[in-house]
């Protein structure tokens, strides 16, 4: 991702036949996505201006200037939209943007290295932090205060308290 860009929204499926579409806003107040001017694709090749927006169940329904048909809206499904960081308000103490965490070392409360923050996901049930250990599969953990008790941007790390029980596949043992 180009330096200084923050993803603030993702376009979803069309809504109706006149070019409206679902939009998932990643701003604290969903309608604030309209306050940051034109939104661009990650590579900066395309730029979009929100013409109208209204809240829906867990997303916004928006129209974009220049998008007038369902077919045009369908072609945009899944696009992430970015703004330069300097258009966003500064963070307050204890606040951060998800982009600030990507690449930070993840350590245990004892200071032992676990890996690096690879991504923050949200599949609908809350934020998930993805940790890439030095070897092996990535860890997908709930981004909660219990699992991530400390985000220290000054020290440049996150503290991860690994859950004592992690559900997963267990080997089948035939009964003897």
Swiss-Prot record:
InterPro entries: PRC_barrel-like_sf, PRC_RimM, RimM, RimM_N, RimM_N_sf, Transl_B-barrel_sf. It is found in: Cytoplasm. GO terms for biological process: ribosomal small subunit biogenesis; rRNA processing. Keywords: Chaperone, Cytoplasm, Ribosome biogenesis, rRNA processing. The PRC barrel domain binds ribosomal protein uS19. Binds ribosomal protein uS19. An accessory protein needed during the final step in the assembly of 30S ribosomal subunit, possibly for assembly of the head region. Essential for efficient processing of 16S rRNA. May be needed both before and after RbfA during the maturation of 16S rRNA. It has affinity for free ribosomal 30S subunits but not for 70S ribosomes. Belongs to the RimM family. GO terms for molecular function: ribosome binding. This is Ribosome maturation factor RimM. Its main location: cytoplasm. The gene is rimM. GO terms for cellular component: cytoplasm; ribosome. The keyword rRNA processing applies. Residues 93-170 form the PRC barrel domain.
């Amino acid at each position: 991702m180009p330096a200084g860009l923050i993803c603030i929204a993702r376009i979803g499926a069309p809504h109706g036949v006149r070019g409206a579409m679902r939009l998932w806003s990643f701003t604290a107040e969903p309608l604030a996505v309209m306050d940051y001017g034109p939104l661009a694709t990650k590579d900066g090749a395309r730029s979009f201006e929100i013409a109208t927006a209204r809240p829906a169940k867990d997303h916004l329904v928006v129209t974009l200037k220049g998008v007038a048909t369902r077919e045009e809206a369908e072609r945009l499904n899944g696009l992430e939209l970015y703004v330069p960081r300097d258009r966003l308000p500064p963070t307050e103490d204890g606040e951060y943007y998800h982009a600030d965490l990507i690449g930070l070392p993840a350590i245990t409360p004892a200071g032992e290295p676990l890996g690096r923050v690879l991504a923050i996901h949200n599949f609908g049930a809350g934020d998930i932090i993805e940790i890439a250990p030095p070897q092996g599969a990535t860890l997908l953990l709930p981004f909660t205060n219990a699992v991530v008790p400390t985000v220290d941007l000054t020290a440049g790390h996150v503290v991860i308290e690994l859950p004592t029980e992690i559900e997963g596949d267990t080997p089948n043992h035939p009964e003897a």
